[in-house]
UniProtKB/Swiss-Prot annotation:
The keyword Plastid applies. The gene is matK. It comes from the Eukaryota. This is Maturase K. Transmembrane segments: none annotated. GO terms for biological process: mRNA processing; RNA splicing; tRNA processing. One of its GO terms (molecular function) is RNA binding. It comes from Matthiola incana.
Length: 504
């Protein structure tokens, strides 16, 4: 996004107010399609087989789209027109796909510029470790072991399009862009109810931006109250009303806030609260009593219903004890495990046995969901029995083998932090046997005959780089013992979710 700022002809103060003209400039389309903004998401997938519509991009199509956008009536196509002229309908569908990609780039410009200006004058250490999604696990291992309760909340989605438009209005001040944004959203809803071969008009990057904007709005209020909660007993609530007045909310919300929240916020004094958001859920952990968690739950319900006009079901916010609950987090099943320890103490001639309990965060692989994801991609059946990949038999033997080896190594690298490696080895076994069955099917042979002809050296390709390195680091006796299966290693070069997690 820093390179995109170099192409802009006006300063940062004006960019937030004049985003709409960027939709009519060809170089923005070049940046959106040729600058790697979408290429990264395509290349990191290990299951992707077909190219998307990005390859259909051309300068001629861009010029036609800009010409049509200058007259918005030409972009409106009813479902009746689509039935009468399918070619016209698919053409307009492709235009909306291009606009969605452009939206995802343009609307991020004010955010990236604001973020860059906030970092000016500050010395920040650039490290990929800070970007790794697995860096949260060492933090949870250090913090969650001291907590008692966790509030697991499913973040509600806006049910009306105007809520999304109003949320974005606080960030983007360009009225023309907001009107165009509202127009495209309503056109999307009219197309969504019609059969377009189950393809979405807008790309995931655009919807991810809308979702993050919605969540960022509620989190800004939550973090504000969380920061002020430890001072609420000794300070007045005027600062809270200033915050509400800043957002210009209606009088009804003032009454609800005055009647409900003062009593709630008076009991929110707890400096030991940690907040984590992940895939439509937020986790709130504390070491206090369940009363505090009920207060926060009641606060979330009132916040979404009164502030955002979103109906929220209280049963979607569950309060659980960490010792009894399993948290689905980044593809892992995390829970607290009590490890009993017996310590022998010698004092003069007397010895004592002291029973101690060590609390440890245990991260496991959800084998059922992983097998379900493998079954969706035709690597095995629903019971976990490997099957051959019929659509890969047209490739060469080396391509088939390299595909399976890459998938196996990515899974091993991602789930290296599991405390039970036997589940990971079961997944590897499914992929190995699926690879052998695919090659045997290609050569019209049985699995036994194919392995007998090539030998066991074929399966040695699946030995991951982690296994090779760890065999050199740890002693051979430890590497072959059962203790090695409980060694957890978090790699801080993982920036994205594994595809098996995305397919859940």
């Amino acid at each position: 996004m820093x390179x995109x700022x170099g192409y802009l002809e006006f300063d940062g103060a004006q960019q937030q107010s004049f985003l709409y003209p960027l939709f009519f400039r060809e170089y923005i389309y070049v940046l959106a399609y040729d600058h790697g903004l979408n290429r990264l998401n395509r290349n990191r997938s290990i299951f992707l087989e077909n190219a998307d519509y990005d390859k259909r991009y051309s300068s001629l199509i861009v010029k036609r789209l800009i010409l049509r956008m200058s007259e918005q009536n030409r972009l409106i196509t009813s479902t009746k027109d689509f039935s009468q002229n399918p070619f016209l309908g698919h053409t307009h569908l492709f235009y909306y796909q291009m606009i969605s990609v452009l939206f995802a780039v343009i609307v991020e410009i004010p955010f990236s510029l604001r973020l860059g200006s906030s970092f000016e004058g500050k010395k920040l250490k650039k490290s990929y470790n800070l970007q790794s999604i697995h860096s949260i696990f060492p933090f949870l291992e250090d913090k969650l072991s001291h907590f008692n309760y966790v509030l697991d909340v499913l973040i509600p989605y806006p049910i009306h399009l105007e809520i999304l438009v109003q949320t974005l209005r606080y960030r983007v001040k360009d009225a023309s862009s907001l009107h165009f944004f509202r127009f495209c959203l309503y056109e999307y809803c009219s197309w969504k109810n019609f059969d377009i071969k189950k393809k979405s008009i807008f790309n995931p990057r655009f919807f991810l931006f809308l979702y993050n904007s919605h969540v960022c709005e509620y989190e800004s209020i939550f973090f504000f109250l969380r920061k002020r909660s430890s001072h609420l007993r000794s300070t007045s609530y005027e600062v809270l009303f200033e915050r509400i007045f800043f957002y210009g909310k209606i009088q009804h919300f003032f009454k609800v806030f005055v009647n409900n929240f003062p009593a709630i916020l008076g009991l929110l004094k707890d400096p030991f609260i940690h907040y984590v958001r992940y895939r439509g859920k937020c986790i709130l952990a504390t070491k206090d009593t369940p009363l505090l968690m009920n207060k926060w739950k009641y606060y979330f319900v009132n916040l979404w219903q009164c502030y955002f006009s979103i109906w929220f079901q209280p049963q979607k916010a569950n309060i659980n004890q960490l010792y009894k609950a399993n948290l689905e987090f980044l593809g892992y099943m995390s829970s607290l495990r009590l490890n009993p320890l017996v310590v022998r103490s010698q004092m003069l001639e007397n010895s004592f046995l002291i029973d101690n309990v060590r609390i440890k965060l245990d991260s496991k692989i959800p084998i059922s969901s992983i097998i379900g994801s493998l079954a969706k991609d035709k690597f095995c059946n629903v019971l976990g029995h490997p099957i051959s990949k019929a659509n890969w038999t047209d490739s060469s033997d080396s391509d088939i083998l390299n595909r399976f080896v890459r998938i196996c190594r990515n899974i091993s690298h991602y789930y290296s932090g599991s405390s039970k490696k036997k589940i990971l080895y079961r997944i590897k076994y499914i992929l190995r046997l699926c690879c052998v069955k695919t090659l045997a099917r290609k050569h019209k042979s049985t699995v036994r005959a194919f392995l007998k002809r090539l030998g066991s050296g074929l399966l040695e390709e699946f030995l991951t780089g982690e296994d090779q390195v760890l065999s050199l680091i740890f002693p051979r006796s430890f590497y072959a013992s059962k203790r090695f299966f409980r060694v957890r290693i978090w790699y801080l070069d993982i920036l994205y979710l594994n595809d098996l997690v995305n397919h859940e």
